[in-house]
């Protein structure tokens, strides 16, 4: 059988040209979508936590990069985990006479920040960040953008179940039927922790852990170590598993565990809610697993949500849950949903950290 090589070359050339054209068209479409949402120098204002915290720093960095890309000027106010400080910042900003195109607002204590969001809503549409609005604040908030805290809690629960299975396989004898669980929660009153605990309880209800204590306040390596040093000595003979607010806090608690004679990953198994902070302990097995929640992605998504709101002046639909993808997807030139959730994925061990990429 004689093969016409020239025909194959022609077909290959056509396929290559078609693929190249599709790529160019996709890139052009994405660029057109971005152009449609350009800010043209309009101002956005963002109220969030301090950049001295690694999560706050990365969230601000992601927001600033996306604002620059879309042509918005971004002014950022940082509070040091203090609602009174944030209240003062809001009052000063309002008194300045500023007229932003939109407000991005992370209330430190949601229930105590109702007056802030009420007054900010008189200036511009409000996008609430990280902590979902409650019934009192929804009349003044147009959209939520950020982490899906229930999903994070569910992911934490599923990962703790895997940790329990791994502990059983390693021959660990539990101190109660389902294993004793010590919880280090976010600061009391922060809705982030409340929602995550709801998600955790929902996915573990059929095979529950025995919660021996819940301690509020661990949210950084320093507070994790300080609080852990006080709590762990009281419960060190009772602990099988630890549920920890985030990896920053876990890194401090690991230090406290070691100082009290407990080896993480052997005597006790830890799971953290999100990946803020150094992930070395996840890679070396001292933390069994965490959730990949890049703060920079949360900041970028908040800017995208605000840009959509500025362009269209309304929300459309209830929920958009962003899928996990290695690269940031193009922005759709549509109104934002009421709830705009960033991607989230579990990561167990070094391979989990290495192989889970979200928006770069």
Annotate each language-model stretch with its function.
Residues 80-135, 142-147, 247-251:
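Beta-alpha junction/loop-to-helix N-cap segments that form part of ligand/metal-binding clefts
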Residues 244, 255-333, 344:
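Exported/periplasmic ABC-transporter solute-binding proteins
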Residues 102-122, 126, 200, 213-281:
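Hydrophobic alpha-helical
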């Amino acid at each position: 059988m004689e093969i016409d090589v020239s025909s194959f070359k022609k077909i290959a050339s056509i396929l290559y040209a078609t693929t190249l054209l599709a790529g160019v068209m996709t890139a052009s479409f994405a660029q057109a979508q971005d152009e449609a949402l350009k800010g043209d120098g309009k101002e956005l204002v963002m109220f969030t936590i301090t950049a001295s915290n690694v999560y706050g720093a990365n969230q601000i960095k992601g927001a600033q990069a996306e604002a620059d890309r879309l042509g918005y000027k971004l002014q950022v106010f940082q509070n040091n985990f203090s609602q009174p400080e944030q209240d003062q910042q809001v009052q000063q900003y309002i008194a300045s006479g500023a007229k932003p195109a939109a407000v991005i607002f992370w209330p430190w204590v949601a229930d105590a920040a109702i007056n802030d969001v009420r007054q900010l809503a008189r200036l511009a549409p409000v996008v609430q960040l990280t902590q979902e609005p409650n019934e009192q604040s929804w009349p003044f908030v147009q959209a939520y953008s950020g982490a899906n805290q229930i999903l994070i809690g569910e992911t934490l629960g599923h990962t703790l179940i895997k940790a329990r299975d791994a502990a059983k396989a390693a021959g660990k004898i539990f101190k109660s039927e389902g294993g004793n669980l010590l919880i280090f929660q976010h600061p009391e009153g922060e809705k982030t922790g409340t929602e995550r605990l709801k998600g955790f309880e929902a996915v573990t209800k059929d095979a529950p852990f025995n919660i021996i204590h819940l301690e509020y306040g661990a949210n950084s390596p320093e507070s994790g170590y300080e609080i852990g040093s006080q709590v762990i000595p009281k419960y060190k003979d009772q602990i099988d598993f630890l549920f920890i607010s985030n990896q920053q806090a876990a890194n401090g608690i690991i230090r406290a565990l070691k100082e009290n004679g407990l080896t993480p990953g052997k005597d006790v198994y830890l799971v953290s809610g999100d990946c803020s902070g150094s992930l070395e302990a996840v890679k070396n097995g001292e933390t069994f697993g965490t959730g990949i929640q890049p703060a920079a992605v949360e900041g970028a998504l908040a800017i995208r949500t605000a840009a959509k709101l500025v362009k269209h002046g309304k929300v459309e639909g209830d929920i958009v849950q962003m899928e996990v993808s290695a690269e940031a997807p193009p922005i759709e030139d549509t109104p934002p949903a009421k709830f705009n959730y960033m991607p989230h994925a579990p990561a167990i061990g070094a391979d989990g950290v290495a192989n889970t990429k979200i928006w770069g």
